[in-house]
Amino acid sequence: MIELRDVVVAYDTRVILDSVNLTIADGETLVILGGSGSGKSTLLRLIIGLQRPTSGQIIVDGVDITTLSEEEFNKVRQKMGMVFQYSALFDSMSVGENVAFGLRVHTNMSDDEIKHIVAERLGWVGLSGYESYMPNELSGGMKKRVSLARAIALDPTLILYDEPSSGLDPITSGTISMLIRGMQERLGCTSIVVTHDMQSAFYVADRIALLDKGKFIEVSKTEDFKNSPNPKVQQFIHGEAEAIDIVTRRDR
């Protein structure tokens, strides 16, 4: 279980997250929605330990990770996988080397054991036989799948996805959504997905949370979220722009 308790992230007078509270159950897929700059990606960085909150607690499996040293957190981080928005593959490494990276750093497995796991994970994401390819030989969707294969190499109990369908065509985006759902079912892991893709959100989520101005204004099951009476939820679902004053040259 993951719990965020009164989490604040602020830079001088700018508040990114404002006393955020949230509980994520084991095995749940939670989708986090919100406008640009609402703090979605900041939340992921906090959970995976790439950033520390200004105040508050982040409890992962009963441990407040905000109190851990970097060495202590590395042990926790081995149970986590992350799929970054732009895949974040190592350009100088082959596909197989990218997927094997965490296994070589964090385990004492033999080369044969690592080779077996790499082949298996690539098979899970539909890229069997791609070990020798270089990242620059892959499409955007294939890079995302390699990133996912790398994220699941260590059998994580938690996978974080930062805009997994960003920059992808609708068909490829649908493939990524199916893989997200498939990994949750295969591994029984907890998944946190940050996305702007409503179709993907509704497909993969058990619950959906909407961040607005540093606070969660809605956290509910997918069907309840769709039918929420909150006008900001409906505005986000239907992509309705807020009215703004536009000054033209003629108006000046």
Language-model segments: residues:
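Conserved ABC ATPase "signature" region
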Residues: 63-64, 111-129
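Conserved ABC ATPase signature
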Residues: 134-138, 142
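A short, proline-enriched helix->beta-strand linker immediately N-terminal to the Walker B motif
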Residues: 153-157
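Catalytic Walker B motif of ABC-type/P-loop ATPase nucleotide-binding domains
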Residues: 159-162
